[in-house]
Amino acid sequence: MWFKNLQLHRLPAPWAVTADRMEKWLAPHAFQPGSSVEMQRVGWASPRDDGALVYSINRQMLLVFRAEKKLLPASVVNQVTKARALELEEQQGFKVGRKQLRELKEQVTDELLPRAFSIRRDTRVWIDTANGWLVIDAAAQALADDVRSLLVKSIDGLPLAGVQVARSPVAAMTDWLLSGDAPGGFTVDQDAELRSSGEGGATVRYVGHALEANDMRRHIEAGKQCMRLAMTWDDRISFVLTPSLTIKRVTPLDVIKEAADPTAQNDDERFDSDFTLMTGELARMLTSLVDILGGDRQDSVPQPAAA
């Protein structure tokens, strides 16, 4: 249930959009399996496999972006194309030109696509309409871009914005390393990456290692800055902070795992409970994180009329 990565975006808080309105926006872009000759197909899928494209509880929504892609390695296409080109050269008595080779490669690709295996990958999107967050569970920026692209295409006038904080995450993480601690209920853990901004970009990584203040000071005085820092919030959630405010390796700790509702009687009730717990904890953590970075500088975003 828990998101592993948090690509953060801002919405108006509150955002007056209902689950029914969201469902109508997404429906024209529902996922449909690709044809035998399509390389890739994307769309919205049901989070609970019940036909609904939006799962909603307590003003929190869950969406699922589904991508289907044909597995057709370039090496296979190139190998078959090369063999076809040799055959063609023998037939016509001269070397295949660039244009002819390109056309041959396209022909080979079209022939192989129907026989290629397909793989589907789902990416979850959490929308907190109460607190104005839209969060994509994606580690790779390219995947997050694909999800955002479909969101913008699907949702009329989506008032989406980046998170703008008063203090640079790099400057803040570097200062926290120097002091060995972070404010606001956050603690510094034992993973960090420091990188020089100079030529060559000399990099030092610590993994599961005590971050001694003297070592950190030596690296920072040499011109390095902290580019990744493992942290824990309120002894409840551990994560890795990055310069772009993308949060990675999100892990709920024991105190949260023990808070799971023991009275849930079935899968639906457990899902409701787990999603409510996750969104509540993450919303509180994100508020605290923005606070220790000087607050949210995002200008007020125009809000669409309530649906």
UniProtKB/Swiss-Prot annotation:
Keywords of the record: Cytoplasm, DNA recombination
Subcellular location: Cytoplasm, Nucleoid
Presence of keyword Ribosomal protein: no
Presence of the UniProt keyword Cytoplasm in the record: yes
Molecular-function GO terms, alphabetical: double-stranded DNA binding
Coiled coil: none
Major localisation: cytoplasm
Pfam families named in the record: RdgC
Any single GO CC term annotated in Swiss-Prot or TrEMBL for this entry: bacterial nucleoid
Biological processes, Gene Ontology terms: DNA recombination; regulation of DNA recombination
InterPro entries for the chain: RdgC
Role of this protein: May be involved in recombination.
PANTHER family per record: RECOMBINATION-ASSOCIATED PROTEIN RDGC
The family this protein is said to belong to: Belongs to the RdgC family.
Protein name as it appears in the record: Recombination-associated protein RdgC
Lineage: Bacteria, Pseudomonadati, Pseudomonadota, Betaproteobacteria, Burkholderiales
Gene for this chain: rdgC
